[in-house]
């Protein structure tokens, strides 16, 4: 309760570094959670431009990705999700910025956990022995906790007043709809696509 959460893990190499053609970086997903009443801010993002789940959706639909999302078996940029799933070589988010962020997350996780780097995980027969970091900051232990909560609320309200690009689709913060999703899942079960 009332804690900031920062969690991440490294993975097997599955992305080329910016400027490279073969996988040397991990997808290294990170989750950030900031308390906000019953609806916390939740950011859950991997370092690849498209999650592997989203690539599966595009593959099944037969639609091309909106932008090049990774490399095919000929080491060429592609919008074909099936080709990226075959090579496991997605582009990093933000191109060179995501490449750097992936590297930093890997090295920090390995250092703090005393574990393997992405390179070392990739040398194993299975994706095991990952380095993971779990940081929890109890806001109740801070002297200015009321001001922190007020700042979070004011920032989120300000963000939501941004003029939407698409009329009828208001701007919302990450995690805003999770309470609705959870409630629906509790009532109707978790949807599973066959």
Regions found by a protein language model. Name each.
Residues 117-194:
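Catalytic-core signal marking the mid-to-C-terminal active-site face
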Residues 15-82:
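Phosphate/diphosphate-binding glycine-rich loops and adjacent basic-rich segments that engage nucleotide
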Residues 1, 5-22:
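Conserved thiamine diphosphate
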Residues 6-9, 33-35, 43-46, 136, ...:
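Short beta-strand segments
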Residues 28, 89, 100, 108, ...:
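General structural feature for long, well-ordered alpha-helical segments within catalytic domains
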Residues 3-4, 37, 48, 76, ...:
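Generic secondary-structure signature for well-ordered alpha-helical cores
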Residues 60-120:
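Secondary-shell segments that build the walls of catalytic and ion/ligand-binding clefts
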